[in-house]
Regions:
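Active-site beta-strand-loop-beta-strand hairpin of nuclease catalytic cores
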Residues: 82-94
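Nucleic-acid endonuclease domains
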Residues: 1-82, 96-263
Length: 263
């Protein structure tokens, strides 16, 4: 039974329909020569273009029919949450997913890398409004410009919207299921270090008074540098969207060789 204090599937359907005009949008302000792509790996281009896309996202406001306006944010200017406010009053956090375009000639390595898109620790149960907040996940790829095929630009070809509170809860459940924990009031997510795992296996008490940033510090917990990667969040809807394009995602180095207990 739907919870009245949470964004409903009907509301997400409404938002999804409102945002449909985004599909096909091409950011020609970012133009790359097709020939230059041959020297780059997809992951390298994704990093470069993704950074530039973040800077150009305010241009989405130039599509009035979708009703998105930049939100003032509640966490400061650069890292403000959420990114947008919809004309309906819904709040939208934007995430970008780079998809490799197999029709473009690039330097493709034999080993793929895990997508870097993530739901970071800046978004927690403390600042998410369960009734109004959604995540907009935009899948984009480089496509030739119609007027000048020798140039390619990032182009939105698919998107999905999700309940933000559901994603945050799924992300945090995975952290705990893997033996991790939060330090502070949802400030720093940590995972067991090699020392911590050894102590746990030996039945010894863990020291949860501090954490480290690297193994050499000898702490029982280390900061989780992979926290919130979308590929690792056990949410059925999110996984279904990622699976649609799995063939062209950078999907290796999954869980540092460990099974995901929540998968």
């Amino acid at each position: 039974m739907p919870r009245p204090d949470r964004i409903s599937s009907a509301t997400l359907d409404y938002l999804r329909n409102e945002l449909k005009p985004l599909v096909g949008t091409q950011f020609r302000i970012l133009s790359l020569p097709v020939k230059a792509l041959q020297a780059f790996e997809p992951s390298q281009v994704g990093t470069i273009v993704g950074t530039l896309m973040d800077a150009c996202i305010p241009h989405l406001e130039g599509i009035p029919q979708v009703g998105l306006k930049k939100h003032e944010g509640i966490l400061g200017d650069r890292e403000g949450y959420p990114d947008y406010k919809h004309s309906s009053g819904l709040r939208v956090e934007l995430k970008l997913l780079y998809i490799d375009n197999p029709t473009l000639e690039m330097k493709r390595p034999p080993t793929r890398r895990e997508p870097s898109a993530r739901l970071t620790q800046k978004v927690t149960v403390k600042n998410v409004n369960p009734a109004t907040d959604a995540m907009l996940l935009i899948a984009y790829r480089l496509e030739p410009q119609a007027e000048n095929p020798s140039l390619v630009s990032p182009t939105i070809f698919d998107f999905e919207v999700f309940s933000m509170i559901e994603l945050v809860e799924a992300r945090d459940r995975r952290l705990l299921a893997c033996g991790g924990r939060w330090f502070g009031d949802y400030e720093t997510p940590t995972i067991l270090s090699r020392v911590g795992k050894a102590k746990l296996k030996a039945g010894l008490a863990l020291d949860d008074t501090s954490y480290g940033r690297k193994e050499s510090e000898g702490k029982d917990y280390n900061e989780d540098t992979n926290f919130g990667k979308l590929q690792r969040i056990p949410h059925a809807g999110l996984k279904a969207f990622l699976n649609k394009n799995r063939e062209f995602l950078e999907v290796s180095e999954a869980t540092n060789g460990q099974a995901d207990p929540t998968a």
